[in-house]
Amino acid sequence: MNGKYEQQGLYRSEYEHDACGVGMVANLSGEANHDIVEKGMTILKRLMHRGATGNDPETGDGAGLLMRIPHGFFKKVLAAKNAKSESFGVAMLFGGEGEEKKIENVIKSEGCEVLGWRDVPVNPDAIGHDARAVMPKIRQLFIATKNTENTKNIENKELCDLCDLCGKNPEASFERRLYIIRREIEKATKDTYVCSCSSRTIVYKGLLLATQLEKFYPDLSDPDFISPFAIVHQRYSTNTFPTWELAHPFRAIAHNGEINAIKGNLTALAAREASLESPTFGDDLKKILPIVHGGQSDSASLDNIFELLVAAGRDAPHAMMMLVPHSPFPNSEGTISVKSPVTGIWFSLTHRR
């Protein structure tokens, strides 16, 4: 008896490591329904063994879901506020009390309109004492572009690259504007954390256990809260202290962390920021710098950079291969050739001026 399970399916004993719990469920037809949201929460609960708690057993290191925005659900919310818009983005905010005017000024300066604020319904009694003691105010801010022709029926359009250099993808222009708005809010305020700010996706997360998420956020139990996919994450905090902000998913990724070369990567990034150029962002590029700010986890930093690459026009697989290049197998001499397709891309990226 060696204590190991036999190889079966995708299971390999040599890949056993401590790790956060990450999962995803999606409807391959692209149809949004509430069943997908429920299955996402079921996956999350089955990843409890991948999470952790501190001294308070009811306060988890973090749990959350990343989903497609349920436009029908939020249109009901807007109708109740006498605000109407066929297309809009939603910013999910932690904190920001007393900074509403600054936030609204940022939105207006980017040519967008504030449709209204919403206090997200929450149940503090469903979470632990420690999490409740540091719980931020949780709100949603609804944002519309003043150019309605550019964003008609966003929720019905097929997801595509964010690049619209050809001028045929105005949806991407609005999505990129929301990205710029988020970055400017982060710089203009001290106590506001933006979980997500998008016309496509939304994040519900917190300093929670997987079993608490649905109870804490009643929105997730509403039959009209639908999505074609759900990305879930149960956090096991190792190299950063657990906080509401550092719970996953982030705006674009849910990640295991433990990036050993993070300091070197961030130093190299900071050294090259001054030479960055982008035909997609143009003069707006300076609004989103620095790309990564201090005090984040390694996964949060990766999310910042991945988000920028996709917003600049690269597709998600391309951006991820740039950031986490595949490790090629050694050749017959036991060395890795820099002429291989993967390492060739990597060396050209890291050594190009």
What is each model feature region?
Residues 1-353:
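Conserved short alpha-helical segments that host acidic/polar catalytic motifs at enzyme active sites
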